[in-house]
Amino acid sequence: MTFGKALLKISRQGEHARIWEYSQAPLQWLGSPGEPPLYYLRNPNGGLLGGDRHHIAIELGAGAGLAIRTQGATRLHPGLIRQQAKVKLAPTSQLIWIPHPTIPGAGADFRQQVQIELDPSARLAYAEIWTAGRLAMGECWQFRRLSSSLRVWVAAGSPSASRQKKLWLQEHIDLRFPHQHVSTASVLGSHLCWGSLYLLGDWPEPTWPTVHVSGTESPHWLVKSPDPVCQGWILRQVGPQAEAIWQQFGQVVQQLAAAQRSSSQGW
């Protein structure tokens, strides 16, 4: 059994950022300061193994920024795997975290919890992209379980007063073998890859270009938050290639980040 940890805190004082990081194998941080700081979250094991229990915590202070990247897809190996991620974003902070796709292999039992707390003036771009299995090997829907829970709290009230957290978004997927209903038209149909891009907080309104994979339009749906406390958009996309979904999400976020920098002339 492996207990991996990856903790990262960034605070900003004027033009300078203070970064505190800690990692415990097999999780590793690899990065350097910049504008914004860019860190890779690495796992030299080539994926998550049965018995793994990983904890990821990211905290950004007021005005701080961070971009997190991965080096490739995350493969889920046979056995029970647990992972918890906690994110806390202070006013006017910005986090971009678009991981590569997650690939659940035969016999994998993956259970994930993602908890996010953000100020309405912060900006979060976060994605989850999944496949039905090791598609290149002809393996589909052979994993035991894929359970992922996402909860987002928004700080409500005046910053000078005692602020309370409002549960703003809650989503949960729980797919279990033999996955009898996943391929129905109301769920995924014939598609073997799917993903969600969450753009929460003070982003410019996004533009979603039409995506074609192998000459076929990749279906997508856009959900806009009606909540006046915190704005947000969620893009759902399905298709035959998880890498294409990941690239599309990354392009959208890059365009938004560039527009944000232009409008604010830097943080």
Swiss-Prot record:
Membrane spanning stretches: none
GO cellular component, one term: cytoplasm
Keyword Chaperone found: yes
GO molecular-function terms, A-Z: nickel cation binding
Keyword terms, alphabetized: Chaperone, Cytoplasm, Nickel insertion
UniProt main location, coarse: cytoplasm
InterPro entries (UniProt xref): UreD
Source organism superkingdom: Bacteria
Subcellular location: Cytoplasm
Keyword Calcium among record annotations: no
Biological role stated in the UniProt entry: Required for maturation of urease via the functional incorporation of the urease nickel metallocenter.
Family: Belongs to the UreD family.
Subunit structure, as described in the record: UreD, UreF and UreG form a complex that acts as a GTP-hydrolysis-dependent molecular chaperone, activating the urease apoprotein by helping to assemble the nickel containing metallocenter of UreC. The UreE protein probably delivers the nickel.
UniProt-recorded name of the protein: Urease accessory protein UreD 2
